[in-house]
Amino acid sequence: GAKAVKWSCEGNPEYTLEETEKAERGTDIIMYISEEEKDFLEDSKVNELLTKYCKFLPIEIISGKKKEWKDGEYKDTTEDNVINDTNPAWTRKPTDLTEEDYEKFYRELYPMAQDPLFHIHLNVDYPFNLTGILYFPKIDNKFEIQKNKIQLYSNQVYVTDSVEGIVPEYLTLLHGVIDSPDIPLNVSRSYLQSDRNVKKISSHITKKVADSLSDIF
């Protein structure tokens, strides 16, 4: 069979690859944490980061066992603690979802928010790839307008909640999720605004919102 490979890196752009011995198939990831970063070894910190960045990853992630309150303390059960939802609402077809499904997903994202006025399900695979669900929030006054409520994902991995340059400024009051592998990451806002796919995505979102508002009013 194929030889096992060991990848090593000391936290800089350089790395080494070498053949090694491994008894079982699969990938082991071993990280060494410095004394100053020991808080990253705490279960609560690990689960916090996994939940933030991998909450909707398409591959099941297990972090220890679920806990239950017993005899005055939390104790591990025999049930795996699954961090993520591998099949979130925005990855499914609109025809497979009910209004209750959309409401449940909104509550999962924003448990303290009022019910939204309406939602828009994005599902495009040409000429760019874009999926997502956007919600138009209920706003009682101008002081309740909150931005940075749209979460950007790339293949179900969380990237950021700062979508300026992708979503028009006047639509950043929307809530929800957009997922696209065609949006370049780690680039400047000006570069984003000049990217052809980003321009198309921005125009598509604007049109979908305008169409929904037109249907209502």
Regions found by a protein language model. Give the residues of each.
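Generic, well-ordered alpha-helical scaffold segments in large soluble proteins
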Residues: 32, 49-53, 105-109, 173, ...
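Short loop/turn segments at secondary-structure transitions that flank enzyme active sites
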Residues: 35, 140-142, 184
